[in-house]
């Protein structure tokens, strides 16, 4: 019986999901992500409001009109 209780407690502890969103903040009209560092498949566009980098995938074209739309 003690083994079952230990197993249940272990599963509950390991299965805990922290509250809040783990996704990066979005920028460049939702096409970019605010990060500390851009990945190799991304390029730096501009700074986000929290001074992190707005990283945009190389597969997406950054048009001048997108930037004026907001952060």
From Swiss-Prot:
It comes from the Eukaryota. One of its GO terms (cellular component) is extracellular region. Residues 1-22 form the signal peptide. Disulfide bonds join 27-54, 34-48, 38-55. It is found in: Secreted. InterPro entries: Beta_defensin_dom (IPR025933). Its main location: secreted. GO terms for biological process: defense response to bacterium; innate immune response. The keyword Cell membrane does not apply. Keywords: Antibiotic, Antimicrobial, Defensin, Disulfide bond, Secreted, Signal. Belongs to the beta-defensin family. Has antibacterial activity. This is Beta-defensin 25. It comes from Rattus norvegicus. The lineage of its organism: Eukaryota, Metazoa, Chordata, Craniata, Vertebrata.
């Amino acid at each position: 019986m003690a083994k079952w209780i230990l197993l249940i407690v272990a599963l509950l502890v390991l299965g805990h999901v922290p509250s809040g969103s783990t996704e990066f903040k979005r920028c460049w009209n939702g096409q970019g992500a605010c990060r500390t560092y851009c990945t190799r498949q991304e390029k730096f566009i501009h700074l986000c409001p929290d001074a992190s980098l707005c990283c945009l995938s190389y597969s997406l074209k950054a048009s001048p009109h997108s930037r004026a739309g907001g952060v």
